[in-house]
């Protein structure tokens, strides 16, 4: 996701 940190699936905050 656009905004995910260097984590493959860290869309916990930019998942809008």
UniProtKB/Swiss-Prot annotation:
The keyword ATP-binding does not apply. It is found in: Secreted. Transmembrane segments: none annotated. One of its GO terms (biological process) is neuropeptide signaling pathway. The keyword Secreted applies. The modification Phenylalanine amide is found at residue 16. GO terms for cellular component: extracellular region. Keywords: Amidation, Neuropeptide, Secreted. Belongs to the FARP (FMRF amide related peptide) family. FMRFamides and FMRFamide-like peptides are neuropeptides. This is Extended FMRFamide-12.
């Amino acid at each position: 996701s656009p905004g995910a940190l260097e984590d493959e699936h860290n869309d916990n905050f930019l998942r809008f």
